[in-house]
Amino acid sequence: MVKAVAVLSSSEGVSGTIFFSQEAEGAPTTVTGDLSGLKPGPHGFHVHALGDTTNGCMSTGPHYNPHGKDHGAPDDEHRHAGDLGNVTVGEDGTAKFTIVDKQIPLIGAQSIIGRAVVVHADPDDLGKGGHELSKTTGNAGGRVACGIIGLQG
């Protein structure tokens, strides 16, 4: 069992903690999270390529995409590995969620440890919105909070 954690923060008052666990190599990764300080509704949620927050969330690079695919929904065959869809925020500005995904391993050459997780301002259109950004970012808007995924003991 490998575990990881990302503590999210932002200059806009958004905060949260995201936990990751993977039982064994080849097994899916379970992601559980708690977020607060967001506007109600769906928000794009992605693993980005870089664990660099020297310029806030802007320096985390593009969505993690080791196979060079177009942006898509979490259940699409062709998608960025880091495309985790949306998290839904309640009227109180908080979200609690669990995601199980096979494309974001903690073990092996394509591990997401050391990369960043990012919450976006707007809903992810899952690559199906017809906007010029749909196939690259899901047209999910600005980056409102992020954290580096680190190994947990």
Swiss-Prot record:
Signal peptide: none annotated. Binds 1 copper ion per subunit. Binds 1 zinc ion per subunit. It is found in: Cytoplasm. Zn(2+) binds at H63, H71, H80, D83. GO terms for cellular component: cytoplasm. Its cofactor is Cu cation; Zn(2+). It holds the Pfam family Sod_Cu. Destroys radicals which are normally produced within the cells and which are toxic to biological systems. The keyword Cytoplasm applies. This is Superoxide dismutase [Cu-Zn]. Disulfide bonds join C57-C146. Cu cation binds at H46, H48, H63, H120. Belongs to the Cu-Zn superoxide dismutase family. Homodimer. InterPro entries: SOD-like_Cu/Zn_dom_sf, SOD_Cu/Zn_/chaperone, SOD_Cu/Zn_BS, SOD_Cu_Zn_dom. It is an enzyme of class 1 (oxidoreductase).
